Amino acid sequence: MSNHMLVERVLKLIKPIVDNLNFELYHLEFKREGNNNYLRIFIDKEEGNISLEDCEAVSRAVSDILDREDPIRDPYYLEVSSPGIERTLYTHEHLKRYIGFNVIVNIQGLLKGKKKYQGKLLSFDESVLRVSCEGEEIVIPKSKISTVNLKDDL
């Protein structure tokens, strides 16, 4: 089973549980690092920060169905956490939520001689992101973007 198919299968199993606990399933990934497999669940909520207790509650709740349905044949470690302050913005919903916030856009290759742009996220559509960098609007083709992360302004 491909990694994408595995993530989709796990997503279908755990999303209703995470939703029922009043958390947002922000992101889900399955990765091999060294000799170990990791299923990482990133949760968020509308108000306040994610606590250790929140992560424990989600971990306990999803462990039951993962053990019962057994979608992952190989041994793995389950990790549940917040997406963090400088979270990656994966989806259109994530981008929409953080319009007006400072972001770091990492570029594949170079764009106007740079590998990275930092500035305020102005807007986006299907093909480009618009970021205000030092007073100049930069239009970045999505095809050139490696990652977009929130910038910690603290």
Swiss-Prot record:
Respond yes or no to whether keyword Cytoplasm is given for this record.
yes
Q: Name one GO biological process term.
A: ribosomal small subunit assembly
The record ties this protein, via InterPro entries, to: Ribosome_maturation_RimP, RimP_C, RimP_C_sf, RimP_N, RimP_N_sf
Keywords recorded for this protein, A-Z: Cytoplasm, Ribosome biogenesis
GO cellular component terms, alphabetically, are:
cytosol
One Pfam family recorded for the sequence: RimP_N
Q: Which residues form a coiled coil?
A: none
Instruction: List where in the cell it is found.
Output: Cytoplasm
Q: What protein family is recorded?
A: Belongs to the RimP family.
Q: What does this protein do?
A: Required for maturation of 30S ribosomal subunits.
**Protein name as annotated:** Ribosome maturation factor RimP
Instruction: Specify the species.
Output: Clostridium kluyveri (strain ATCC 8527 / DSM 555 / NBRC 12016 / NCIMB 10680 / K1)
Whichever gene encodes this chain, its name is rimP
